[in-house]
Amino acid sequence: AVELIVGLHYVYDAPQDKIVFDVGHQAYAHKIITGRRDAFRHNRQKDGISGFPKRSESEYDAFGAGHSSTSISAALGFAEAAKLLGQPYKSVALIGDGSLTGGLAFEGLNNTGVSKADMLVILNDNNISIDRNIGALHEYLLRITTNPKYNQAKKRVWDGLGESRFRNMLQRIVATTKSYLVRGSGGHLFQALGFRYFIFISCAKSVRHRLENIRINFKF
């Protein structure tokens, strides 16, 4: 999430643009680059900074997160407010795959798709959560990332080439192969909910370019 958060702050003009985090575990890099680097050593300690985004702590913390699955609905609120007030700021929700299994996140997706709000939802599908993810939506995302064609191709590549000084190059090839094989299935659910879906980003170097393209060229 570090590269993604740096990319978001490079492309979007926070605090005018609203970057909304789901819970606080993805927001540490955000806190460090928004004036709290020295205070971060006291993160989650008595009299230290909060472990979660906190509006009273920084103007860059657009929404006070705590409970999971709230980011999409909160970002939708900012987007609707911008439209009603005639303000030009953008609204972004960053949510992990664990939080996306919560009912409030699904409600937010449904309402956002209907509203056609000018906002961006980023799914950080890192397969990390405090407890094991459960539910139909998790199973859907799991099927996307465990496509058998991708795994078979990956196994053949590594079995055939083994250890090599070109390992880094081969890892990039595998990532590109994964992107190609799953791109056709990844967006069906989100498109059905009314979203314009963009293929996932597997290479950190492409984060800034992809975000700039979306920020400048698309109104949702």
Regions found by a protein language model. Name each.
Residues 22-23, 94-95, 120-124, 220:
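Short beta-strand segments
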Residues 91, 119-120, 197:
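Hydrophobic anchor at the start of a short beta-strand
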Residues 25-26, 36-40, 46-49, 116, ...:
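Alpha-helix initiation and N-capping motif
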Residues 127-215, 220:
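Long, well-ordered, tryptophan-enriched scaffold segments
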